[in-house]
């Protein structure tokens, strides 16, 4: 949709009755000054551009009439931080211009008593200068340094009360003001007192563009002390809702004999205290459940079956079982992330399982593959079986249904294929073969680690059996 320069589309012009989203990026609207956005209060702002001057004047006017900054923020749809910053800067410098540093302070409104005193001094001594009247006001303790009028203000009062007179008198007043300015620059009174007027510029003076409205000095309010009845009433209302509306706050203020503003501030402080207590309670509950990290029962883990090559010294090799039907393939527990399944013949005794390097098949977290020896008399290693959970114990002692493979069909296939025919024997496997030469009770004369494998060694028996996977028993794939 194309629009003319300076025109605001009617459909995207923010109206007072629209509800704008409270989260996410603000809406974008077209304004005469450029592409604007809508804040959370529904007001339009342009990022990087200062607030318009008429809104700044309105903020100061509302604050002059005693309206609180939070109410000004909601009515003008300007953020609370922007309102507070403008009011604070105006109170310090007397300027509402964006980025103003320094400038003149707001003009002091002279009280009628001070004006009468100035007229009295002038009548008693018609030749008294304005700066002399100012010093006499301070000397007689009519005003203090914060409330004493400036030299220009005294001159303006004298001109309005006694008339302009002749041109010479006006020139004398101007020279007098200039002389007082020069004196004030080098005196302590001039440094601590207010300056006469701001310098003129091409854009106009600061006084002409500023809203010449005195603001009440923000005084520290003493903390409100609530009685037991008031606290009980407020706590009951807080149990019903943490965010009462204006009607609930006014009704509660009448019952508790408080102002609506005090009730609103109390609920804000009470919500902050409630959030702090809720966070502390959650932290205490978390520490109570997990005093030293994770609890032992929360994450059951299997014992690690890792045996170092140097510490394992086979002293005896169990005999092979004569009945091949009773031979069981006992699966080794794998890491949770491992999905590969390995099939190792069980008639090869436990020492033969160490002849395959684990790095060849990707088991980097296991130094060696452990397969318990098969046999009815020694179903598992008792030293390792003591640390197993009942589920794993039942899995290892479950005999049946797994076909027997001859020793020559030595295959391990964690991926899609098995060992390659050109696979060489590892150094650790050769060392163990040297240690096992003195054993007389080997099941067969076939070596445990042949240098090469024939292609016939990869055939599988077409007998239907079961393989133990990660999620229980499943029928193997038939080739």
Swiss-Prot record:
Q: What is its main location?
A: nucleus
Localization terms from the record: Nucleus
Biased composition, class Polar residues, residue ranges: 309-329, 338-351
So what does this one do? Transcription factor that may regulate cell proliferation, migration and apoptosis. Involved in neural development and myogenesis. Transcriptional activator of MITF, acting synergistically with SOX10.
Q: Which residues carry this modification: Phosphoserine?
A: 201, 205, 209
Name the protein family: Belongs to the paired homeobox family.
Basic and acidic residues composition bias: residue spans:
172-188
- PAI subdomain: annotated segments: 37-93
Q: Does the keyword Cell inner membrane apply?
A: no
Record note on quaternary structure: Can bind to DNA as homodimer or a heterodimer with PAX7. Interacts with DAXX. Interacts with PAXBP1; the interaction links PAX3 to a WDR5-containing histone methyltransferase complex. Interacts with TBX18. Interacts with SOX10.
GO cellular component, as recorded: nucleus; transcription regulator complex
In its UniProt record, which GO terms are filed under biological process? cardiac muscle cell differentiation; cell migration; cell population proliferation; developmental pigmentation; heart development; mammary gland specification; muscle organ development; myoblast migration
Q: Which CDD domains match?
A: homeodomain, PAX
GO molecular function terms attached to this record: chromatin binding; DNA-binding transcription factor activity; DNA-binding transcription factor activity, RNA polymerase II-specific; sequence-specific DNA binding; transcription coregulator binding
PROSITE patterns membership: HOMEOBOX_1 (PS00027), HOMEOBOX_2 (PS50071), PAIRED_1 (PS00034), PAIRED_2 (PS51057)
Q: Which UniProt keywords apply?
A: Developmental protein, Disease variant, DNA-binding, Homeobox, Myogenesis, Neurogenesis, Nucleus, Paired box, Phosphoprotein, Transcription, Transcription regulation
Q: What is this protein called?
A: Paired box protein Pax-3
Native species: Mus musculus (Mouse)
Q: Where is this region: RED subdomain?
A: 113-161
Instruction: Identify one Pfam family in the record.
Output: Homeodomain
Q: Does the entry feature the keyword Iron-sulfur, yes or no?
A: no
